[in-house]
Amino acid sequence: MDLPFGPRYNIGIDVGGTNTDGVLYDCVDKRIVASVKIPTEHASYAKAIDNSLKALTASIDDNGSEVASVNISTTVSTNALLEGKGEPSNLILIGFDRYPHIVSDIEGAIGPSSVLKVRGGHTGWGKERETFDPRAVENFAKDHRGELFTVSSMYSPRNPRHETAAKEILLANGSGHVTCSHELSYSRLNSVKRTVTAYLNTSLVPLAERLIDDIGSVAKKYGLSCPVMFLRSDSALVPSEWCRRFPIEMIYSGPAASLRGACHIAGGESLDSFVAVDIGGTSTDIGRIYLGRAVFSDAGAKIGSYQTMIPSLNIMSIALGGDSRTEVCGTEDIRIGPERSVPLCMTAQDSGLQAETVIKDLLGCPDEAEGIGRSEADGSPKPLMTDDVPRTADLGKWMAMGYSYTPTDAFNTMELSEVGDPKISKAASYLKGKKAGTAGYDLAEAVAVKAHSMLESSISEYTSACGQLPRVYVGTPAKVFAKLGDNGEAEITVPRNFDVAGAVGAAVSSIELNCRVSIMHSFSDESFRSEERRVG
C-alpha cells in the first residue's frame, strides 16, 4: 500500500534494566500491531535490540521500507553514571582563578583526569574580563592528544567565545570529543552545575558512540533504512547523531518514554490529568500528566548525586521493582532493594533444570520436597510439613549466581502472578518462612505489603504538592500493585498494553525543535546583535 505521506509504521524500543520491550505501531490506524518483551542482557544492549527488531519486523510483509523510524529509549546513560562507568575527561577552566571555591566544588563533584586553569572569561553582561590564553590550551592539547576534553568558561552562557576558541584549538591538535559547557547550559547560569553537566556528557560519549554504531548495524541487518531516533529526558525525539554528541540528554530517556506511553494508552480511559506509575523489574518511576501534557521539573534531571542542567520531566525514581532483592528476617523485618536480582522462580527456566530438581536443591530434602510444593501451591497459610527445615536447605548456591527472593516470588506464592515457575517461588517462600518462624504464605504476604507500602509512601511524597489524583499503573507488575492498592482510597487504572508502555511512548513520540535567540550587547561599539542557537 503506497501512502502519500510515506511509511506507515514506527518501531518503539524501550531498553530497561530488566526487560527490553518493543512495539510495532501503525501511525495511520493509530494502533499497536505487535509487541515483544525480551530479557535485557547488560553485556550487550544491542543484542536485546537485535532480538526485538527480529520479532517486530517479522510482522511486516515487505522488507522494512514501510518503517518510518526506529525510536529508542534507554537507561544506558543512567546506568553508566550510577555505576561509575563513564570515561575520564580532561577539564579546562577558563577565567576561574578568582573563584577557588567554585573550582573546589567542581573538582569534588567529578574528579577529572587533569585540570588546566586558563586566563580569560567574561562578566555577567558578556563582556570579556580577561584576554583568553590560547597558547596554554594548545600546549595542554598536545600533551593529551587523542583524549577527551571538557571546556568551561566563566559566564559562557552570556558569551561563549572563549569556550569556542578553546574547542577549535583542541580539535586542531588531535583531541577526542570536546564538550563546551555553554552547549548544555540552556542559557542558564550556574558554574558548577553547568561544568558538571558538560563533564558527564563527555564521559558518556564513547559509550554512546558504540551503542549507536551497534544499533545502526542491527537496523541494516533487518533492511531498515529509516532514521534511528532516541528519546531525550524531556520526551522529545532526537537523531542518533545528536545523541552521539549529547548523550547526557538521554539520562531520563526510559522514564520519559514510560510517561509518554502512559499518557497515550490512558487516553482511551478518558483521563487527562493523573499520576503515572511505571513499575518495572528494577525500579519504579512516578510522573504526572496535567491536561494531557507531562509536567516538567524546574531543577533539571538529577541522577545519583549529580544535579544537571538537562531539561527533564518531573519524575521520581525509586529502587523498587518486581526483581528487587528482598532480605527477610521476620514479617516485621523486611528489606526490599535497592539491588536488583533474578527471581528464584526463573532458576529452572534459566538453568534448563526441572522445577522439582530446583525445589529439592533449594530445600535440601529430596524425599519431601514434592509435598512442600503441593502444600504451598494450594494457597494454604499452613505448610504441610511442620518439622524444621533441614540444615542443608540453603539459597546460597543460587544467590551466588545472581538469584534471590524477590517481590515477584512473593506475588507468585500469593497467586497474584505467574512468572517463571510459581512452584519454585512457593518452595522458596516456605523456606524463608520457616527460617523466620512463620508460614510461607504469610511471609509472602508480608513482603507484598512491604512493597505496596514503599510504593504508597513514594506516591504520597510525589503528590504532596498537588493532592490526590487518579493513578495509571503501567509496567509488568502493574496489575499486582493495583490489586494490592485496591482499598477504595485511590482511583487506579491499568490500561491496555500496560506492560509495554515505555515502548509505546518511544513509538508515538515526536521531534521537537527549540531555538533560543540571545540579544548580545557589543561593548566595543555599543551595538546589539542577535545570536540564534538550536537547542533541540
What are these regions (language model features)?
Residues 1-534:
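N-terminally biased helix-coil "hinge/interface" segments that flank
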